[in-house]
Regions:
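AAA+/P-loop NTPase substrate/partner-engagement loops
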Residues: 1-34
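Short, basic, glycine/proline-bearing loop/turn elements
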Residues: 38-42
């Protein structure tokens, strides 16, 4: 079978700490197929963006591994979200991450009825 990881990104980030980060990052990097669900809904910070997300995406880009993203944000909005940290508006680190997202994924807008409550 194919190793697939569906990761609710905000939950992953909220559960992540410095001590367990390397183990999680290596496991996610090794997945044959990765789906990062609800990216952009997490509490962003520079460490998560630069040391977690960028490292995962860089590996997946270099290995040409299938990577999917779901988000309520358009690419431009996601870039702005990634730029906003407590320290400042860090547009260049966010642009580096977004270059990897754009390499790995094509933006597709899905519209329709929210069926979560049906």
């Amino acid at each position: 079978g194919i190793s697939t990881t569906l990761l609710h990104y905000p939950t992953f980030i909220s559960d992540l700490d410095f001590d367990n980060a390397k183990v999680w990052v290596n496991e996610i990097k090794a997945s044959q197929v990765l789906v990062l669900d609800d990216i952009g809904a997490e509490q962003n910070n520079a460490w998560v963006r630069d040391s977690i997300l960028q490292v995962i995406l860089q590996h997946r880009m270099q290995e040409n591994l299938p990577t999917f993203f779901t988000s309520n944000l358009r690419m431009e909005e996601l870039e702005q979200h990634l730029a906003e940290t407590k320290r400042a508006d860090e547009i260049w680190p966010a642009k580096r991450v977004m270059e990897r997202v754009k390499y790995l994924a094509e933006e597709m807008r899905l519209e329709g009825t929210n069926r979560r409550h049906d």
